[in-house]
């Protein structure tokens, strides 16, 4: 289903079978940000939302909050907000309840820097929910400085944007299979980014790969680079996962909401000085309004069917994966997959995947 004005549906080709995006990415960026208008979702376009149950992580601010507003306006009956701060989540939920007073809105703790929190969240989904129609894994961050997560020893961007997101994905898939409403497969959409295509990935040959991000002497720190490569790792992981999970059971895809103003993800609010001012101006000039970026979430969930399984969606269309998949995917996909499953072995990730 198109979400651009006057957009025509083109023949469906899976992301992995497309030609890669050009290395010179400015024309793609220009088209996305200045030549494409994402239409806001309506009940007529997305009747599937009405009466459903959804999980949205990172839903108290930015794109997650705006997407929650839109979904509730479409008639969503039950929203589970996965948030790190219960206090901030409750404040956001109160605003949402004014928009949809008849909907049930629950605020559940989810700290993506804590394996215990992620496992507890997944367990609640299993024990407390009788139905889950779709999940949007929106929680993510773009740290402005190097930081390790004390409990895991991993750099925080790689931890949250890839490793923890992979864990939650793996834990939720068998749960989703048992919580389907029966007439359509549940959906799981992870938020990804065009920056996965743009990263330089200088440590791609380091082994072990994931651990190489934890030492700036091995992999020099760059905020923009690290955000992009964290999304690349998760993209490669999802591609492999979708070879194992059938779209008849769960439809899994990835969505890029585009550069969006009105969120804190870019980290420019923390920079200060001239750098912060320039970054803020860039977002203000080039960024999509937050409601347009959020509209791409609904389109990813219900604007596409099984043909989007394992695909990367950009401006509401199935788009190529990051260039690294086409040039180094034969090695990197398996490397990322194996190292991630090894990292998550404590949670039984290998057994879960083998029994999906």
Task: Give the role of each language-model region.
Residues 20-266, 350-355:
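Rossmann-fold NAD(P)H-dependent dehydrogenase/reductase core
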Residues 173, 238-242, 298-301, 337, ...:
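Non-transmembrane alpha-helical segments in soluble domains
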